[in-house]
Amino acid sequence: MVLIGVLASLLILQLSYSKSLDDGAKESAYDDEIQQSSWGNSTVNTTLTETVVIQLIMGGSECYKSKHPFLVYLYNSAGFFCSGTLLNHEWVLTAAHCNRDDIQLKLGVHNVHVHYEDEQIRVPKEKLCCLSTKNCTQWSQDIMLIRLNSSVNNSKHIEPLSLPSRPPSMGSDCTVMGWGTITSPKVTYPKVPHCVDIKILHNPVCQAAYPTMSRKNILCAGVLEGGKDSCKGDSGGPLICDGQIQGIVSWGRFPCAQLLEPGVYTKVFDYIDWIKGIIAGN
């Protein structure tokens, strides 16, 4: 039944894709050239006419305060730009394209305009991107570890999220969350993080949606009928399946949450040895 569903989805995708080409639309792709948008988030210039926007939560609702103690708010002098995930008392996982010179990290926050008693703020002591300490612009490896300048303490609103013990199953029910825009193409940033439930999509479906995309080290997640997606401002945040971080919000098409256009996530399990080695001091 799963195979039949995948084949049916592929047929729909191919028909839709053929029509889009007939209408003069271009495929989206991404490369290593990063451009800062007016919203303080990164976009990727493509070699084609359509721009891929670094991701953003659509179709969801406010997260319960108690459901995101691992969610980290990344900002600088220009304001909020990304999210991250607390892995232990001194390490945060986010996307490499979220790298900035003056990052600050706020933990234990829900409403960004409210100060919480156990809220803690840190700055990076060390940043490691794309399996290298020197290069943070390889979009095929959109992952970054941030070592905090001092340890954080567990509290009511601060607690790490588990790394994956196995790769995610195709079709798994997962949740993505962040402070990204809740409307698209008009951008509306919420005061509180939003959560939305989506599914890990089969590789053939993902490949049909993005024919030029490399499938290495990435996941596609969303709903094929659209309406639910990560979006502008959600970059670096977690895709959570069965209580473990399986993905990092990376990129997608804009406007978000469109029919047959799922979001793209860095596949955390593919980097598990690197992550554990760094955290262990290797």
Swiss-Prot record:
It comes from the Eukaryota. Its main location: secreted. Expressed by the venom gland. Keywords: Disulfide bond, Glycoprotein, Hemostasis impairing toxin, Hydrolase, Protease, Secreted, Serine protease, Signal, Toxin. The keyword Transcription regulation does not apply. CDD domains: Tryp_SPc. Its EC number is 3.4.21.-. The active site is at 97 (charge relay system), 142 (charge relay system), 235 (charge relay system). Pfam families: Trypsin. GO terms for biological process: proteolysis. Residues 1-18 form the signal peptide. Monomer. Belongs to the peptidase S1 family. Snake venom subfamily. This is Snake venom serine protease BmSP. It comes from Bungarus multicinctus.
